[in-house]
Amino acid sequence: MDKNEDVEIEYWCNGNKRSEVHYNCNGKEEGLRTDWYESGAKEREAHYKNGIAEGLRTDWYESGAKKMECRNKTWEDRVGNTYTNLHGKKTEWYESGAKKSECKYSTGRITGIANTWYESGQIEFEIPFKIGV
């Protein structure tokens, strides 16, 4: 493991990068975190703010095909509790590139229509969601 001020890099036994994590002055994850498969293919990119997942996260299959993309949002309630949840569109794909599922989140709860597809492209489910119901 290399540590250079605010960046920590870990390696697989074969010498390929395993992860690269940036830290703020308080020692908490800050900014982009990247993880790789042992083969060297990128596995995940996620953004952090003060140690909490915040913003875009993208995952890939080892083949390089996009697997999942979503956003996290952090907020604080009236008594100072901090919450991080999915917020916005979340999309998943089959390794072939065909869309697998798509739904929208609002502060961690599915809202609107959630869709799932078979790998052939045929719709599997279309489920409406409404917050509070």
Model feature map: region roles:
Residues M1-V133:
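Glycine/tyrosine- and acidic-biased, solvent-exposed loop/turn segments at the edges of beta-strands
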